[in-house]
UniProtKB/Swiss-Prot annotation:
This is FO synthase. It catalyses: 5-amino-6-(D-ribitylamino)uracil + L-tyrosine + S-adenosyl-L-methionine = 5-amino-5-(4-hydroxybenzyl)-6-(D-ribitylimino)-5,6-dihydrouracil + 2-iminoacetate + 5'-deoxyadenosine + L-methionine + H(+); 5-amino-5-(4-hydroxybenzyl)-6-(D-ribitylimino)-5,6-dihydrouracil + S-adenosyl-L-methionine = 7,8-didemethyl-8-hydroxy-5-deazariboflavin + 5'-deoxyadenosine + L-methionine + NH4(+) + H(+). [4Fe-4S] cluster 1 binds at residues 83, 87, 90. It comes from Streptomyces avermitilis (strain ATCC 31267 / DSM 46492 / JCM 5070 / NBRC 14893 / NCIMB 12804 / NRRL 8165 / MA-4680). Residues 70-401 are annotated as: CofG-like. Residues 69-319, 528-763 form the Radical SAM core domain. The lineage of its organism: Bacteria, Bacillati, Actinomycetota, Actinomycetes, Kitasatosporales. Residues 505-838 are annotated as: CofH-like. GO terms for molecular function: 4 iron, 4 sulfur cluster binding; 5-amino-6-(D-ribitylamino)uracil--L-tyrosine 4-hydroxyphenyl transferase activity; 7,8-didemethyl-8-hydroxy-5-deazariboflavin synthase activity; metal ion binding. It comes from the Bacteria. InterPro entries: Aldolase_TIM, CofG_family, CofH/MnqC-like_C, CofH_family, Elp3/MiaA/NifB-like_rSAM, F420, FO_synthase_su2, rSAM.
Amino acid sequence: MTTSATSGTGPTANSMRRALKRARDGVALDVTEAAVLLQARGEDLDDLTASAARVRDAGLEAAGRAGVITYSKSVFIPLTRLCRDKCHYCTFVTVPGKLRRAGHGMFMSPDEVLDIARKGAALGCKEALITLGDKPEDRWPEAREWLDAHGYDDTIAYVRAISIRILEETGLLPHLNPGVMSWTDFQRLKPVAPSMGMMLETTATRLWSEPGGPHHGSPDKEPAVRLRVLEDAGRSSVPFTSGILIGIGETYEERAESLFALRKISRAYHGIQELIIQNFRAKPDTAMRGMPDAELDELIATVAVARHIMGPRACLQAPPNLVDSEYGRLIGAGIDDWGGVSPLTIDHVNPERPWPQIDLLREQSAQAGFELRERLCVYPEFVQRGEPWLDPRLLPHVRALADPASGLAHADATVEGHPWQEPEEAFVAQGRTDLHHSIDTEGRTGDRRDDFDVVYGDWEALREAAAPGMVPERIDTDVRQALATAANDPTRLTDAEALALLHADGPALDALTRIADDVRKAAVGDDVTYIVTRNINFTNVCYTGCRFCAFAQRRTDADAYTLSLEQVADRAQQAWDVGAVEVCMQGGIHPDLPGTAYFDIAKAVKERVPGMHVHAFSPMEVVNGATRTGLSIREWLTAAKEAGLDSIPGTAAEILDDEVRWVLTKGKLPTATWIEVITTAHELGIRSSSTMMYGHVDQPRHWLGHFRTLARIQQQTGGFTEFVTLPFIHTNAPVYLAGIARPGPTTRDNRAVMAMARLLLHPHIPNIQTSWVKLGTEGAAEMLRSGANDLGGTLMEETISRMAGSSYGSYKSVKDLIAVAEAAGRPAKPRTTLYGEVPQERQRAAAASDGHLPELLPVLD
């Protein structure tokens, strides 16, 4: 079969010879060379596969599995065969009428699923491969009706629920293939499945966009969408299976490009656990029934090229039921895995191709010099890595079946159900719980983690991704005209004018800050507001992988800590005693904390100090709580409000532009999800602050987009209490230590951002706050002359900025904050979280103690 869409006679002898030599010598291939090698046949193919096999063997030896080829003993569970896509080669997908005529429901029932899983467990299977069509409820009313009738919001909710039952009632480990997933879907499913998967298939967009293409009419087969899923899997630290489908009309160049796209993502996140090379097999009753099957040599060459591209550490699989008896050739080409093989169920995607018997695979592997060993659905490397790749709720299930030495399946493991539950003793005080004191006296233990080179992804790939954002823009707009517009009516500033002002310097910047200060005075007057509050960061254990964050620690790190509920309540009581009206509580995404932990924290404070305003839980924490409890964001926020939550911080925003976010953070929520959390909170009457962290890999155009987004949200909901500028603290930030980020914003940046925040958010967000924690007393006073009207809080303790390297301390007294206001020539006034009047009783308590705790030590210079 010829898969090239271009006319031509194939590669020249010289180009093939050069490419083969580079492969033999272990030199990195490019797309052109890979496309040449994909066409190797005869002796050239033998040469190619021999070098690929050597690469594979080196990887197995390095992994401690020399001479081992693996497989997973599984059952195939087709949860639903309905799908919103229309792939032209697919025989798995059907329509509601056919299901009804065959006596089947729109989805398999829980009893049907568990019956298969129990039978599989009895046969020693350890994997439940759950495969289904993409979002069937979006196309088929019958699917929507089934989900509604059974109490599920969507298909993902059913997948989550049935996975828990499989874990608890059978002991099998779910491997989930629900198709295209969102970032939030990954958060929902990660706690219930050790691994997931989705074939990339191809990056050839024309096969999706052009009529007659195999993926035309299938929204979930757009290559850009599928690549985004692979990125989100990596960001979410989900062990993920992917691969390509060959022989569906792609050119050799397109096939090579698909492999390089997979390599790029694998290198960036280290999360692709296996790569499948699947050969097209035509099926009757499909639009592509007349297309010839991919030839065996096509498959062999692609496996070998994939091995060279992906390298020795990659796990490479070719489905054994899609060839006849040529197992030895697949092994010789560089595979090290046979994939899932079931002694019970058929391959529902390729029903005409039965699985080979496991004994046959063992025999064929032995003939090629390999020992066949069983693995779990999650590969041994991830079993041994543990966190953050495996959720703590899954660890007991995985460990019950895994050989602790190799990470492969334990030969004598009993497959039986275990409770799926939160780890015990989630709220036990652990670690450096005095960090709120000692960060100012002793400092942090070290400036970087020992897993610095792997935990945040591939730094070289990040440098490439960050490069476009680091290029300064050329500004041609007349700054003088922009200043005139700002002075006359800042709401009429065009994007071009706003961008020009964000670049202002010298006299133009001075004029800009004066205009912003005038707008501030007209909007909110001269009072500089502040709040007597206490920060309570209840844990710094976090595996999200934010590259700007120096606060997050692994549970075993010297600076890691978690507070008990009693300690949280004690700190709230201490704050109340010295005049606080608010506690601001945030923490790392600790894998051991249940989704209900946030409710418990809010309740603990309210029970101890009923009058305290609970300002807590960033949008990232909201999403974490919702996904861990199985609630929607709206349901979770409603429950949190009932538990005592009064408002939420608008942190985790960083820059509301995913171009920047995915450089700054590996696993934090995307922009759209941040907006969803904030707007949902506002709709429920839960107000929030808004923030922007700037001065890293961003540019003024990103700041402008961020301001415009916040203004739109405020016009829709009116729920923001203030906007807070957060200059990036670079000193201990991983993204700076890796040489990618700038060393924080300049003084010019700070003045321009503050002034433009005032102008671009006017009149929608009247309160603009500066951060003394990040800028110090003089810097904060300068911001008060540039458009700010609020100094934030006394804090009483602060660890996030201090861990990052800020040198301005962990607290300010009331007198300190009044002095900052006076330095700007303005009066100071206390406020509540919602910018209301502070009760006299609270003011008296604050005055008596100066708004800070007596046991706090002075900040060391």
